[in-house]
């Protein structure tokens, strides 16, 4: 639950078994789950200690995608390659804006996003990416500058 993007195989099973053991989920289990899925689904999963299968995990937003077992690693590599192909400065700024924004009132979150947007305009990668976009060409490899 600590990952930014979660994918799984179609035979994956998820659950929070702790209450069946007489304890609460620890290490952020209750807090992360409630932020990923609705508080109601989080409570149902935690209170009942029941497992759910991959299609249900996808439906409630616990995972982003489900793949056949044989395709999972390829899908993960393709997703990682797409992220790696993006401008690192922009990816970091986007992650920061999303994570901080979730903890802020909307008006403050919009300001956080605007600052992240503005910070990207100071980079060589932004200039290269924008130039490629306007020329309708593929951007060159980003340099993290």
Where are these regions (language model features)?
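Terminal low-complexity tails and localization/encapsulation signals of metabolic enzymes
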Residues: 131-145
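Crotonase-fold acyl-CoA enzyme core
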Residues: 1-89, 123, 128-131
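Active-site-adjacent beta-strand/loop module that shapes the phosphate/pyrophosphate-binding cleft
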Residues: 98
